[in-house]
Amino acid sequence: MAVTWTEEQKKVITLRDRNILVSAAAGSGKTAVLVQRILSKIMDPDRPVDIDRLLIMTFTRAAAGEMKERISAAIEQALYDEPDNEHLQRQMTLIHNAQITTIDGFCAWIIRNYFHMISLDPGYRIAEEGELKLLKEDVMKDLLEEAYSEADEKFISLVECYATGKNDDNIRDMVLKLYDSAMSQPFPEEWLEKCMEVYRCETLEELEKEEWMTLLWDAVEEKIQQAEILIHRSLEICDSPEGPYLYRDAMESDALFCQGIRKVAEERDYNGLKAVLDEHNYTKLSLKRDKNIDAAKKDMVKDLRAEEKEIWRELSEKYLSQTAEDMLVLLHCCRKPLEGLVELTAKFAEAFTAKKREKNVLDFMDMEHLALEILVQKEGDILEPTQAARELSQRYEEVMVDEYQEDRKSVV
């Protein structure tokens, strides 16, 4: 039975010579569409591609195995329909060596084939979870003993702020969590250093240029748009037959309030926006009655307005709870202990890596970073492909990823 693809699915299957990102809900057929795209590439009458010229990566080994089975079955079916097709016969042979693997598996393949580029002992092995846990504990113990012995001002500040009177488990947990976050980034050392940039702001002008301020204004814009939709819908209901027209004055007042917020937000005036939100008094909904007004429509407007008010409340309390000046003071107060945390985490990363090299073991994060080191040369902010990357770009016609984790930036 032939599968009927939607127009969106057809685009994913047939689009060529461009990058494609597919976002869809679980169970919506993403993998089936990817398999069909692979088959369409293999069986393209004008530009047929050999299966081993496609790099296909999935999230789990089970998914990789299932995908290989699906592709094999589809090729077998096509070969059944065209038994004399030499290209299809060739694909049945090539699929056994095709790169249909996990992302970690592909990283391991890169390291095995290019280990000489990073001076890695080819006899390495992947460490077990229990072994890694013990190594981390040993490294952390030595690291903290050294830190207490040196009594660096930043470290002592960190301990005074976050350690309890009985133990320093909080410090250990914070270091390990920050380490895991750093290792999910393509360049952990740079990321750790960048974490401190905002805490080193000396002026409001510097604070306003921080990346997170841009994210804040993006969030503000999103909130404004949500409120505008609610207000517009409320006014439509007020003007509808049997609508609560007596509520129109209050909703028009909200519309003007929203316009004022948008104007201040467009000027990127943080304190101004905070003041507008803090000082605003809502116009009350009219208490007058009219028996011709639909009660259900009245309730709809009330609910929409309550939702709108909640947007402004969240914006005020979650995003603009302090003035910019107070925020700068708080950042300065946090600077020393957090610098201690970042420096301790960087030392832990260095010591943990050294311990793993000493035992000639790797973990999965190591594999991602070593593969990246093999493929990319970084000079300042400029990334250049290495010779290995150029070789691989010639080897593969297309790279397809079935699923990935957005928080693993080293993979993305």
Predicted segments — roles?
Residues I56, E406-D407:
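Residues immediately C-terminal
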